[in-house]
Amino acid sequence: MARIAGVDIPRDKRVEVSLTYIYGIGLTRAKAILAKAGVNPDIRVKDLEDGDIQKLRGATEAFTIEGDLRRQEGMALKRLQDIGCVRGRRHRMSLPVRGQRTRTNARTRRGARKTVAGKKK
């Protein structure tokens, strides 16, 4: 397996698809990286030469990916929670952040139903 940005990318897939296994790189960004590095996107990772892998490593360094990106996103959420804005409070309470309704729906964000005992007759 080729190792780029600390991630083992699959050998049997096309380079274009394999790059998407790196957190922060989708298909569009993978195509841009391949164009910048001058690597054929249709070639399989196992057929890449060492020089091509080095070019890809250099091209991916221009982007914020993997651990740095995860840390950046986490710090952005923490900042919202620390300043106490509405978005931060909604994140803290595990509720939808962008104004969706919560009286019904929002099950994914709120989790499974918690049954409240009814009044006995």
Curated annotation (Swiss-Prot):
Name recorded for this polypeptide: Small ribosomal subunit protein uS13
Keywords of the record: Ribonucleoprotein, Ribosomal protein, RNA-binding, rRNA-binding, tRNA-binding
Listed GO biological process terms: translation
Coiled coil: none
Molecular function GO terms recorded: rRNA binding; structural constituent of ribosome; tRNA binding
Basic residues bias (residue ranges): 100-121
Subunit-level organization: Part of the 30S ribosomal subunit. Forms a loose heterodimer with protein S19. Forms two bridges to the 50S subunit in the 70S ribosome.
Matches recorded under SUPFAM superfamilies: S13-like H2TH domain (SSF46946)
GO terms for cellular component: cytosol; small ribosomal subunit
Lineage, top ranks: Bacteria, Bacillati, Cyanobacteriota, Cyanophyceae, Synechococcales
